[in-house]
Amino acid sequence: MKPKITMGLLLLICNAVLAQTTSTVPLAAVNHKPQWEFHALNQVWLRYNESNPGTTVLGEPQSHTTDIGLRRTRFQAYGEVAPKVFLYFQVGQNNFNRMTNLNGNRKNTFFIHDALCEYSVLGDRLKLGGGLTIANGLSRFSQPSIATILALDVPVFAQTTVDQTDQFSRKLSVVARGQIHRWDYRIVLSDPFPVQSNGVVPPAIGPNATFALKTHRMQQQVMIGYNFFDQEPLKTPYMAGTYLGKKKVLNVSLGAIYQGNATWYLSSGNNGLDTQYAAMKSACMEVFYDAPLNRQKGSALHLYLGLFSTNYGKNYLRFNGIMNPADGLTVAGLAKDAGSQYGNAYPMFGTGKVAYLQQAYLLPQNFLGEVSQHGQLQVYATECLTQYQRFNDQTHMNWSCGLNWLMPGNQSKLTMDLSNRHAIQLFQSDLYTVTRKSTFTIQYQINI
């Protein structure tokens, strides 16, 4: 995708907005009463984790850990403050456990996740907005509705720049999105943050690509999808994980992200080592199916397949551990450009290819008895296969399976999840070892 194409589309949309603003304000707008919604969410984890080899916690070797944490705590306020005018705010915090340490201070402060202003130019056919927002162009899992996550967690690799050049996947952006007949689209122009402001000392430039400390380019994103049955809600930019049989949804989507000079690395030249810049280019094709099997009994089926091409530049690789329960390693000689490798970390992001699959079955409502008294069960499984350039395109797989107890729906949800990951240790020589490690997590979510 070329930046000129995205800019041209945005200019055409801006012209449409200017044409709309020449009309007079109807009397109904003056008398309009704002319609606000307020929501709160908390996700608590109790977790047992088999540690990566050599892991330490506060200086003590630990082959396994048990921890309690807050995966997400959020407050949302949004609504139509005037006809066609939509305002969305979200604040919160993420990944708060015993290892939380912000410059020697465990007092984790809430920060702004979203602050989006949006105007409906042509109803749902065209909405224009701007601000700090999750809206982007790659995949539905790049902008997930956290209250409706189907598995224990989302596939975070789809949030390509999370906490590198964004604010927990949110970016300062201008957005055009909408639905035209059965087509759903979004076009986004984002202004990335410099990587050196993410709170972590960035690695020095080396032979493998890392996010560049110099130069700045805007980021262009686009996503388009076709809905075969029910259309998905368009009120906020977030995309649902599951509708629990309330909708019949089948869509196919294509998405892409492009940013020039996003990463850099050193290459051998005539005069020694030369600094080379690389564009970040990622694309996705995905199929999402979420529909009732038996409406009378309340059973439902969920299937998802996403094929991703993620290009960050030469040999880019980054480890990440969700709410990591550890803080150190006894192993020497590990690669310094790929992030921390202790605890539950694994190579989550990289230049290469990724396939992500997700399946679920929502059991009939009366499987446990009266659903209003006993809730409903949902079983699920996920598989993630990666082929990263840094590992010579060798295939590695992570998987998980679990059970959701919905009491009722996602408002009160208990999840039990077993996951298994490839625990890779990557050395500076680019040699690596592979073992398998598991994690068992119990989550309780309340969403109001």
Kindly label every feature range from the protein language model:
Residues L46-G69, L87, N95-N101, G199-P202, ...:
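Primarily recognizes Gram-negative and organellar outer-membrane beta-barrels
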Residues Q20-T21, P34-T55, G255-Q259, T263-L266:
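Short glycine/proline- and aromatic-enriched beta-strand/turn motifs that initiate or cap beta-hairpins
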Residues M1-S23:
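Bacterial Sec-dependent N-terminal signal peptides
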Residues L27-S51, S63-Q196, K214-E232, S309, ...:
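Outer membrane beta-barrel
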Residues N103-G104, V200, G206-A212, N271:
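Active-site rim elements
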Residues S51, P61-Q62, L244-I448:
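Outer-membrane beta-barrel pore domains
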Residues Q20-V30, T236-G241:
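A short, compositionally biased domain-edge/stem linker segment
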Residues T210-T263:
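Loop-centered beta-sheet repeat module
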